[in-house]
Each structure stands twice: as C-alpha cells, then as structure tokens.
Amino acid sequence: MCIRDSYEGVSVFAGVGERIREGHELWHEMRKSGMLDKTLMVFGQMDESPGVRFRFGLSALTYAEYLRDSLQREVLFVVDNIFRFIQAGSEVSSLLGRMPALVGYQPTLTTEVAEIEERIISTDRGAITSVQAVYVPADDMTDPAVAAVLGHLDTTVVLSRGQAGKGIYPAVDPLASASKMMDRHVLGDRHYAVAQGVREHLARYRELEDVIAMLGLAELSPRDREIVMRARKLQRYLTQPFHVTSAQTSIDGASVPLEHTLSDCEAFLRGDHDATSEDACYMRGAMDTATETSA
C-alpha cells in the first residue's frame, strides 16, 4: 500500500479497555501488512483493573512522547477507545468514594481528559498526530464525556447508523462531521466552495427526505428534484473501497487524489453526471472509471 511504503514515522496504538480477541486479531493484521516494525502496541485489556486501564492510555502517550522528543520521530498516536479511558477513570473515582457529577461521571472528568489531550502536541523535535475512536453513548453528542473529548479535537468524523443502513461505507455523516481546517484561508477558495456546495446539496436532500417518503419525487419542484438527484449521486460517490477491507468485500481498494475528488465534485454540482446512474457512482473511486459503466 502506498501509505505503508511512504510513511517514515512511527505509530503508537493504545488499546484502552480493548477486548483480548480484538487486540490479538489486530496484532496479526499488522504483522500480515508488514507494519509491525513501525508500530508500538500498548494494551490495557478489558479484564484488567480500572486503575490499570486508566493508566495505560497515559503510558502509551509517554511512549509517543519519548519517540517524539528523544528519537525525534513523527508519531501517529491511535487510541481505541478514548471513552473507555474515561470509563476507567469513572470506576476509579467510584472506588475512591468521590461524589459523581453530571450523568454519573467523575467530578474530575474534564481534568482527566485534558491531562491526556493537552500532551498531544508538536515540538521543535517532532510531532504527535492523534486519531481517537470516541464511543458515543446512545448516539448523544451532548454526553459530558463526549463533549469533553470533542473540545480538544481539530476534526471530528462522525460515523452514522443511518448511513450504514443505506449501505454507505465508510458510514461518514458529512453534515455531522466538522473540522477547524474548514476555512477559506486554509483550504483556498476552490476547495472551500466545492465543500460548501456538496454540504448544501446533502443538507437540502436530508430536509426533503420525509417529503419524498410521503409524497414522492413528483411533488418536488424541478430545482429540488435536480438537487436530490445530484445529492444521491454525491452520497454514493463519497463511498470508498478500502484496501484493508478488500479481503472481506472482494472489492479492490482505491485511493483518489484530492485534485480528482475536487474535480469530480465540481462535475456533480454542475450536472455533468446527471446522465450517470447512481450505481455507477458507488464504490468506484474516481468518476473517470464510473462514467464508463453508467446506464
């Protein structure tokens, strides 16, 4: 894979409260992909005591800091799952007899989250970039634990049950996801305009879904029908066959350069692919291959 071959940094994986079976499977997958020589894996397994699980996240971060500061390496710090780190802290708090705070969480919730998040920084010696899985209880984004974590993140990618139910994989909800980098001065005028245009189409389609379910497409205005048609194709275009899932899906992985993605989205917004079938946009990668199989 191109990322594996070109990546010159090191990765630290922190499995906080990870199931033993899942950790074992991940280790074998990493060995099979040839990434173990660039990866450090730290597990605080779910059968460990709350104190051990709570400290393991901080221990893994200490390894990442050593690689950054002493070896001057670029570090990718992956945490699965940061919510289990918070849960372990809550269990420790209960054992210490502390009075619970909001929704039963520990009174030191924000302090404990900040203790790990604020150490993930770049220095003149190297950088730590972190990717963290955040479990959302009952899909409630306002949960105190979730809110405490999200406040420290630059970008949030929300995986939606609704998207998965439609067969959209990865099941990313573009409207619920957000990034501090989504700024015209950071992205440039073209990238920002394309992103906003895609979001506007998807947002309008979501507003009209209930109307379509009750009355059908025929009751929409010509402009709304056009937006819905293009939004549905954009939704399918944003699916991506992953290299790591090719063994399960029998679909070869595809990587699409940013320039191709922007050009394809511009073409959708202009209506260049209005004659292309929705199926031709699904799991295809770049549209230059999709149009060849359009209906």
Q: Which residues fall in each region the model found?
A:
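Fold-independent oxyanion-binding glycine-rich loops
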Residues: G15-V16, G44-M46, N81, A133-V134
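Residue-level marker for buried hydrophobic side chains located in beta-strands
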Residues: A14, F77-V78, M283
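Loop/turn-to-beta-strand initiation segments
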Residues: E8-S11, D37-L40, L71-L76, R125-V131
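Short, small-residue-biased leader/transition segments that mark boundaries at the very start
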Residues: M1-I3
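Nucleotide-state-sensitive switch-loop elements of NTP-binding domains
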Residues: Y7-S11, E18-Y66, V92-E112
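Residue-level signal for short amphipathic helical patches enriched in basic/charged
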Residues: E18, S33, S70, T123, ...
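Phosphate-binding/switch loop-helix module in NTP-utilizing enzymes
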Residues: R53-G89
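Conserved catalytic/coupling modules of large nucleotide/cofactor-utilizing molecular machines
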Residues: T62, Y66, R84-F85, E91-A295
